[in-house]
Every structure is written in structure tokens, then in C-alpha cells.
UniProtKB/Swiss-Prot annotation:
Single strand-specific metallo-endoribonuclease involved in late-stage 70S ribosome quality control and in maturation of the 3' terminus of the 16S rRNA. PROSITE patterns: UPF0054. Signal peptide: none annotated. This is Endoribonuclease YbeY. PANTHER family: ENDORIBONUCLEASE YBEY, CHLOROPLASTIC (PTHR46986:SF1). It is found in: Cytoplasm. Its main location: cytoplasm. Its cofactor is Zn(2+). InterPro entries: MetalPrtase_cat_dom_sf_prd, YbeY, YbeY_CS. It is an enzyme of class 3 (hydrolase). Pfam families: YbeY (PF02130). The gene is ybeY. HAMAP family: Endoribonucl_YbeY (MF_00009).
């Protein structure tokens, strides 16, 4: 099950479209979805989460809490819409393109991909590109 919660005025234009894509990605990685909760919020909401649970005091675009077991993905993904807007301007990307990348990045973390080392970053970036390509070419939706 995939749930979407909104702590901001923003709402996804088509939750079904995103859910179908996420299910596709997860199945391609030979995993299953138990429960994924996407919480869209603002910077203040997310920095409070960052402070409270991670003891960090800076803005970020996404925080993922992983409760997955074996092949069953279970997690909460908090996404700052304001940070996505900021980063889309900074990186000269369309807002929804940046949002899709952040969403799939978080899902890949739940699947088990890491991005601490350069080789891990490279692999994760390539996976993001592949799954964004599938979405863009409408192989998924």
C-alpha cells in the first residue's frame, strides 16, 4: 500500500500515476511493498524531523525512515516541497522532474541502495536515470 499525506498546500497531480511507477520500480528490483507513506511538507516541518530524530540542524529535501524487512518495503518518506522547488531552480530542472528524482531516490534507499561512496553514488544515479526513463517513455503508466 502506498499512502500520500500532505502537510502543505501542495498535492500530487495524480497519485495513481506515481503509485503505479513506484510499484513498477519495486517489482523490477524483486521487492514488494508492505507500506510506503509519502509525507509532503515544508522546510520547517522537515527540519523539525531532522532535529528530533537525526540530531541534525539543516534543511534537506528528503528524509526516509526505513522499517523494511527482507523483501518487504515499509517506510516513511518526508519530502520538503519548498526544498524541491529551490533545488529545481538551482539545478535548472523542472519542479516535477526534481520531485520524481527525489521520490525514486528515497525508494531506492528503501530497496537497499546506498550513496555514501562514489561508486554507490554512481550506481544509484544510474538506477534513478533508468527508472526516470521508464516513466518518461510511458513504459510504466
Amino acid at each position: 500500500m502506498i499512502n500520500y499525506y500532505y502537510e502543505t498546500k501542495f498535492h500530487l497531480y495524480n497519485e495513481f500515476y506515481f503509485s503505479k511507477w513506484i510499484f513498477f520500480v519495486v517489482s523490477k528490483e524483486n521487492k514488494f511493498i508492505k507500506e510506503l507513506n509519502f509525507i509532503f511538507c515544508d522546510d520547517q516541518y522537515l527540519i523539525n524531523i531532522n532535529n528530533k530524530y537525526l540530531n541534525k540542524n539543516y534543511y534537506t529535501d528528503v528524509i526516509t525512515f526505513d522499517n523494511s524487512e527482507d523483501k518487504n518495503l515499509d517506510g516513511d518518506i518526508f519530502i520538503s516541497i519548498k526544498r524541491i522547488k529551490y533545488n529545481s531552480l538551482k539545478f535548472k530542472k523542472l519542479f516535477y522532474d526534481e520531485l520524481k528524482r527525489v521520490i525514486i531516490h528515497a525508494v531506492l534507499h528503501l530497496i537497499g541502495y546506498k550513496d555514501k561512496k562514489e561508486t554507490e553514488k554512481y550506481i544509484m544515479s544510474k538506477k534513478e536515470d533508468i527508472y526516470l526513463f521508464f516513466l518518461k517513455k510511458k513504459y510504466v503508466c
